[in-house]
């Protein structure tokens, strides 16, 4: 029991990770490595859309084809759909099973390979799947207890992180709406014309040229840019005689201006 408690503490310590670590490209490499080291297996975590969130390989089991999934950090749709249909931990799936993570073309090399898939969900929301696999040794009850704990820990983190991201998105959209509301009719026309000049989210523009084209004064454009820049929506830099370099920091401005039909 003490041995299991020690392993459990190692896994739950992942909750102490910072938000900055969760914003990494593969935020759950640490917990998959801990789990792989404790249980002696390969491990990976995918979200409900199949994006790879973290993985660690103790054993070489992938072919070049499957290795590509880990390189691109996205799993095939059919596998993801199957994983999302698993509502309780499915343990020790043989290589012949459709949800085995062992590549079809290498199953003869790993005839005793076993896959375990644990759903990651919190409050009825499906967030992803935790997948572990071994070449030839069955996952015992103690291993499965740790997997259940790990999936719960990851689920709590994912849900909290998702809520934080949702709150950030709301604050961002609110900032854009408030900034656009401060613009006059002429300034809105100017902003619409300016955004149309950009190549994606950034580009070079000449205020006097835009002003002449839409029939407003250059000062209107300058005032509009100043308001958006003070709100943190854009940043600009004078290029002297060449015009002004503009970069959009909050892309929601495109949709907000479009909604106003300017």
From Swiss-Prot:
CC annotations in GO: cytoplasm
Region feature GAF domain, mapped onto this chain: 1-159
CDD domains noted in UniProt: HTH_ARSR
GO MF, one annotated term: DNA binding
Keywords: Cytoplasm, DNA-binding, Repressor, Transcription, Transcription regulation
SUPFAM superfamilies for this protein: Winged helix' DNA-binding domain (SSF46785)
InterPro entries: ArsR-like_HTH (IPR011991), CodY (IPR014154), GAF-like_dom_sf (IPR029016), GTP_trans_reg_CodY_C (IPR013198), Transc_reg_CodY_N (IPR010312), WH-like_DNA-bd_sf (IPR036388), WH_DNA-bd_sf (IPR036390)
Binding region for DNA: 207-226
Cellular compartments annotated: Cytoplasm
Biological process annotations from GO: negative regulation of DNA-templated transcription
Role: DNA-binding global transcriptional regulator which is involved in the adaptive response to starvation and acts by directly or indirectly controlling the expression of numerous genes in response to nutrient availability. During rapid exponential growth, CodY is highly active and represses genes whose products allow adaptation to nutrient depletion.
Protein family (similarity comment): Belongs to the CodY family.
PANTHER family, sorted: GLOBAL TRANSCRIPTIONAL REGULATOR CODY (PTHR40062:SF1), GTP-SENSING TRANSCRIPTIONAL PLEIOTROPIC REPRESSOR CODY (PTHR40062)
UniProt protein name: Global transcriptional regulator CodY
Biological source species: Streptococcus pneumoniae (strain Hungary19A-6)
Gene behind the chain: codY
